[in-house]
Amino acid sequence: MAAPDQVRGGVLVRSAFAHEGAARLLVHRLKYEAVAGMANRMAVALEPLLGVEAKALVPIPRVIARRWKYGIDPAAALATALARRAEIPVVHCLRAHFWVRRRAGTSASPRILPSFRLRVPTPVGAVLIDDVVTTGTTLVAASSTTGSRLAITFTASGSRG
């Protein structure tokens, strides 16, 4: 089932699917099993979400410790696969922290707000890329750092806002 466009903290978020069923399984295989080939399949669904204004793709990086643990940065894999299809560059503008407490899931524990540092200037027409949007706080933090107001994700779940 397709997810409707939404605005989260001033960021327009376009998602290919709701975070359920087969789409959720694809995200899980990419994110936690490091099946990198999933990114190519997922990019097929993401390409129509890019507008003509998209001039560069900026993946929202996974925390370094999780990249090591799971062997993949899902947003970078998606951005790379999508860039090949759309023939636009990937620019790694954002630097993630080494480690932060886990935010995803249903735990009622207080959330740690994500933050990023800018590695290189953000190009005009940059589109943020991530695998899934839940509350939108990660996208908003990335947007605050880069200035980009458009994000493309494979799936969307969680609260709207």
Walk through the language-model features, giving the residues of each.
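Glycine-rich phosphate/pyrophosphate-handling loop used in enzymes and phosphotransfer proteins
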Residues: 1-161
